[in-house]
Swiss-Prot record:
Compartments in which it is found: Cell junction, Adherens junction; Cell membrane
UniProt xrefs under PANTHER family: TRANSMEMBRANE PROTEIN 204
Keyword Acyltransferase set for record: no
Function of the molecule: Can influence paracellular permeability. Appears to be involved in cell-cell interactions through adherens.
Protein's UniProt name: Transmembrane protein 204
Topology in membrane: Multi-pass membrane protein
InterPro entries noted in UniProt: TMEM204 (IPR038992)
Cytoplasmic face of the membrane: 1-5, 125-136, 192-226
Any one GO cellular component localisation term in the record: adherens junction
The organism of origin for this protein: Mus musculus
GO biological process: lymph vessel development; regulation of vascular endothelial growth factor receptor signaling pathway; smooth muscle cell differentiation
Segments on the Extracellular face: 27-103, 158-170
Record carries keyword Ubl conjugation: no
Glycosylated residues, chain numbering: N164
Amino acid sequence: MTLQKLVATAVLVALVSLILNNAAAFTPNWVYQTLEDGRKRSVGLWKSCWLVDRGKGVTSPGTRTGQVDTHDCEVLGWGSESAGFQESRGTVKLQFDMMRACNLVATAALVVGQITFILGLTGLPLMSPESQCWEEAMAAAFQLASFVLVIGLVTFYRIGPYTNLSWSCYLNIGACLLATLAAAMLIWNILHRREDCMAPRVIVISRSLTARFRRGLDNDYVESPC
């Protein structure tokens, strides 16, 4: 049995989702925050950087003259208070912690789906392309990734007046949509296969049965694949 193009396309879509999800996680452009003194900074899941306002000539603390093109960045982690600077610290800290956890779970689920696809190509008994469990395992992994990303993104439904969502957040939304699309393609393929198996068996009788007075007639028939 040859590998179905729909399954390969779904896995490719999930791979793009995995790339976008990691790109959104490791870029410091999840939100933009404006401080009272006019300084601006971009905050990501794992990094925060001060931005240089070229119009006003405002630079980040500790930046020397002539270094207007550099960013002063700091690493963020679980429960970082600096992510909520200028906003409600407790709320923003919870938002970023939730998104970090959901991002890691989604990454793991997408990687498991890719590994399942590769194992199926090796011809393992339980994960072969002929086994329906192979597609179901990939669909479950991609659907889990989509589900947890939705949970994480919903936490950013309400943000403070000094904060604006940036392109990394929208990049993660695209990753969520692609993971959903990959899971939907596999689920549709599974259901379509089941409908084919529920159809009645087709028996084609050989023309040799119409011959008269012939001994040893063979009842040749062809059944449906299911």
